[in-house]
């Protein structure tokens, strides 16, 4: 499975990775979201005003074969951060293993918002835009 158009940019502070995932990965993620969207709402945990949020069990990501892709992207991000800092030798000596703490869906609609915030107990946060309405 080829991940295309991967680039790291640094518009401010930290490096930001952008990548286009294969359509098969997007399809698998959408299938997971469609299955769990009616589960217990976790929206009260969010920083903003969002009506619907559902946590995704790691087993579903593993079953759909997308967990490895998320780990590969995380590892690639870390590698590029080390290389950008001129730390190739340090990177080459490391055996980096990534771990996903949690993953959830956010169904955001008109007049809902989620302000800038941080996620505790993690070093990398990511966002996937799966179903974006036409503008």
Regions found by a protein language model. Name each.
Residues 1-92, 113:
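Non-heme Fe(II)/2-oxoglutarate
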Residues 85-110:
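Hydrophobic beta-strand-centered segment that forms part of the acyl-chain substrate-binding groove
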